[in-house]
Amino acid sequence: MAFADRLLAAWYAGHPALALLRPLEALYRRVVTRKRARFLSGESASYRAPVPVIVVGNITVGGTGKTPMILWLIEHCRRQGLKVGVVSRGYGAKPPQHPWHVQADQPAEQAGDEPLLIVQRTGVPLVIDPDRSRAVQALLASDAPDLILCDDGMQHYRLARDLELVLIDAVRGLGNRRCLPAGPLREPAERLGEADAVLFNGAEADRDDGFSFRLQPSALINLRSGERRALDLFPAGQALHAVAGIGNPQRFFNTLLGLNWQPVPHPFADHAPYSREVLSFSPPLPLVMTEKDAVKCRPFAADDWWYLAVDAVPSAAFSAWFDGQLDRLLPGRPRP
């Protein structure tokens, strides 16, 4: 297990040795708290877009199901007759310049895996730039969205936001509730109280402190042919290689177990690069990966490589709440 993986596991398990890092944690907390205070007071300037901006992010390190939720928000807004644009940091992407408009036929190395996935799945206009406010301005210069979704960027206060949605893994929660580097929190836990909504990935039902949502497997997609097959393509007990380079690989492996398959787990670092050689495992078995990994592997995929398509399914209460927020932010919006 790589050092980063061991550290992540320690954060969520609450390893006692992390107490040694608390002096650094105290310094980190002061820095991030002061940064936020500067923007809230107006001491540091934020850019406010002429259309509503909805930030979808988290305060923890590690995967929370953010990309599937963004896909759900895009499609939900479209069903309401709204045009949606997306901005993202584009973690790991190496575009020729910033800001960069992502197109569906660009390589993942240039566009970033998550932005490319979003564009390939939905076709929305999407701009990547570490400076999210600059990304929004570039998006508005080329398109006319009714609203903009900011993929992550919870801590990017240079971009003013009209709505904040925070996602949390319901199983791992906030770990030991410590800030970096003594724990997995990017901001103190009290920050959750300032968000407009908290969504718990994998919660059985809505909670007093937030809404629930789950990730529902929908199909197997062949990387080479694009063929879409039902989940009964593989019988119960099927052994297969499982590849996940996401923030929480175990969640993906657990999903495969829940489908009654027998995955041989191959966890990789989030946003990891791949090659045919790296993914040539023994014994020869079908290979199933996440959709996020698939956007990087299509150029060299084998015939028996598949990705598991998953869809976010939020609670009915969240859907109703979100529609109310759209009414507030866009009072003259079209009705379906």
From Swiss-Prot:
Sequence positions that bind ATP: 60-67
The pathway is:
Glycolipid biosynthesis; lipid IV(A) biosynthesis; lipid IV(A) from (3R)-3-hydroxytetradecanoyl-[acyl-carrier-protein] and UDP-N-acetyl-alpha-D-glucosamine: step 6/6
Going by the UniProt record, its keywords in alphabetical order are: ATP-binding, Kinase, Lipid A biosynthesis, Lipid biosynthesis, Lipid metabolism, Nucleotide-binding, Transferase
Which EC number(s) does UniProt give? 2.7.1.130
Q: Name one Pfam family in it.
A: LpxK
Protein role: Transfers the gamma-phosphate of ATP to the 4'-position of a tetraacyldisaccharide 1-phosphate intermediate (termed DS-1-P) to form tetraacyldisaccharide 1,4'-bis-phosphate (lipid IVA).
Q: Which family does it belong to?
A: Belongs to the LpxK family.
- Recorded protein name is Tetraacyldisaccharide 4'-kinase
The gene designation is lpxK
